[in-house]
């Protein structure tokens, strides 16, 4: 479903003659990333897996933003932010830090996690429940903070 939506949107962008526009290039890059993952796995991806690929693309762009900002490359910062906005249209609504903290607290309570040694009991179920809706690093930071790490 999501892969077809990406293809349809790319066709629409092509027909609208958006050849030089960033949206078309972002859609092409996203579809290439999805296709590469399908080649690696030798099968078609599920929607959840496509979301994972797109989230990875967003994360990679977010990771380079601080470098571009430190380098004074306002043009590249704006380009990356625009690409992130385009990609986020295809991702589920992201959980707020408060929602993440509530989920982590609930899992700590449910699992009886006591400290950092029990972080696995918390991270696995929370990440499964928030798949595609929360950045793993933010969930991990929250879990560490709440577990006293």
Q: Across the structure, where does each feature detected by a protein language model lie?
A:
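Residues that recognize and position ribonucleotide moieties
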Residues: 120
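Short, basic interhelical loop/turn and adjoining N-cap
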Residues: 133-134
């Amino acid at each position: 479903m999501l892969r077809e939506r990406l293809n349809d949107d790319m066709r629409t962008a092509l027909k609208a003659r958006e050849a030089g526009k960033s949206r078309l290039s972002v859609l092409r890059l996203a579809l290439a990333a999805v296709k590469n993952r399908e080649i690696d796995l030798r099968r078609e991806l599920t929607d959840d897996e496509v979301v994972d690929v797109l989230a990875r693309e967003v994360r990679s762009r977010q990771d380079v933003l601080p470098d571009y900002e430190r380098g004074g490359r306002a043009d590249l910062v704006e380009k990356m932010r625009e690409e992130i906005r385009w990609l986020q249209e295809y991702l589920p609504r992201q959980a707020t830090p408060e929602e993440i903290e509530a989920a982590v607290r609930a899992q700590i309570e449910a699992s009886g996690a006591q400290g950092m040694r029990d972080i696995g009991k918390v991270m696995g179920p929370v990440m499964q429940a928030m798949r595609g809706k929360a950045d793993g690093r933010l969930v991990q930071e929250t879990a560490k903070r709440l577990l006293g790490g």
